Amino acid sequence: MPAGVGNASGSVLDMTSVRTVPSAVALVTFAGAALSGVIPAIARADPVGHQVTYTVTTTSDLMANIRYMSADPPSMAAFNADSSKYMITLHTPIAGGQPLVYTATLANPSQWAIVTASGGLRVNPEFHCEIVVDGQVVVSQDGGSGVQCSTRPW
């Protein structure tokens, strides 16, 4: 055997290398198996918030005043101090039988989801509102010249 090849016993294989290679293969295999369980869990993680859909309809054509929560306030005090940061206010036309739909992403819709609609006519426009959270109807209300849907008492 040429000088510098092999180990002290003259063997080409060094037992230290033989033991190290299977350990490295086992480590890589174990790490791959562990990550394959983690990556799908990360991909399935819940989104940051809940998809909230507000729908308003009426039986008459009119200019409606609509307000809905578009973002979670950090507290009721923050909301009371400046509700315009969290609630959208619109003065918009609405056609009888044609729904107006607005969406928001809220972290805590059971605390903050609300939509109101009102309008003035000599005949009540018969408003209807609905709140859907993550595809499930959670509130539905009917009203005459105005209506409010919320997930908690205001």
Curated annotation (Swiss-Prot):
First-listed, main subcellular location of the protein, grouped into a coarse class: membrane
Subcellular location, record wording: Membrane
Superkingdom of the source species: Bacteria
UniProt KW keywords: Membrane, Transmembrane, Transmembrane helix
Any single Gene Ontology cellular-component annotation: membrane
Transferase listed as a keyword: no
InterPro entries, per the entry: UCP021591 (IPR016793)
Membrane topology: Single-pass membrane protein
Transmembrane segments: 23-43
Protein name: Uncharacterized protein Rv2576c
